[in-house]
Amino acid sequence: GDDRRQRQMCIRDRLIIDELDEAKTQLKDMLLGKFGESSKTVVVEEFLEGIEMSCFVLFDGKNYKVLPYAKDYKRIGENDTGLNTGGMGSVSPVPFLDKKLKQKIEDKIIKPTVEGIKNENIDYKGFIFIGLINVKNEPYVIEYNVRMGDPETQVVLSRLKNDFVDVLTCCENQTLDKIDFHFDMKTYTNVVLA
C-alpha cells in the first residue's frame, strides 16, 4: 500500500529501501527473475544521504575546463515529493557549493577522472557530466555521463558568455587551455512543465 510505497523509492531501475526485511523481499524477487532481464544483475550499494548537484567538464583530450555547476530537482511533486523524473527544473549557481567544496571536487574527482581517461588512452573529446552528492561536505560520485544533463544544460549554457561555437572549436583543436571562460554570475533557473 501507500506505507510500503513511502518506504521504498524506485529511481528508474533502482530501488532505495530503508528496511532490511523489505530489502530481503525485493532481492529475493529480483533473483527469482520477477523483473525479467533486469533481474539478471543485482548491485547493492551504500545509501548516501545528502544533496545532489551536477558538475560539467569540457575535455579536449588533453585539457579540461569546468563549466558552472547546477542543481536539478527530480521529484515530480511540490516540495520535493513524488516520484523521481529526469528533472523538473534546475538552478545555477548551486547555493550550497562553496570554494572549498569545489576544490575537493576538482582534486578528488575531476583531475583523477581526466587523468584516468588519458592513462587508458581513451580517445575522447567532449562533455563529462558528473552527478555528485554532497555528504557532510564530502563529494561522492553517483554517476558519469558523456553528455550534458537535462534540464541543467539550459541554466549552465545560459551562464556561458563565450561564443559556444568558439568553445567547441577549441575543444576539437585541443586548445581549451588557450581560452578563458567567462560566466554570468547571476542566478539562472528553469522549470519543466509536465
Give short role names for the model-derived ranges.
Residues E106-I128, N145-A194:
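Active-site "cap" helix and flanking loop/linker of ATP-utilizing ligase/carboxylase catalytic domains
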Residues V57, N63-I109, N145-L160:
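ATP-dependent carboxylate/phosphate-activation module, predominantly the ATP-grasp catalytic core
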Residues L15, T25-M30, E45, E52-T81, ...:
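Beta-strand scaffold of nucleotide-dependent catalytic cores
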Residues G1-R7, I11:
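Single conserved hydrophobic/aromatic residue that forms the stacking wall/gate
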Residues M9-C10, V44, V66, V191:
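Generic preference for hydrophobic
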Residues Q8, G33-S39, E46-G50, V57-G61, ...:
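Solvent-exposed alpha-helices and their adjacent loops that cap or buttress functional pockets
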Residues I16-S54, K111-E120:
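Conserved ATP-binding module of the ATP-grasp superfamily
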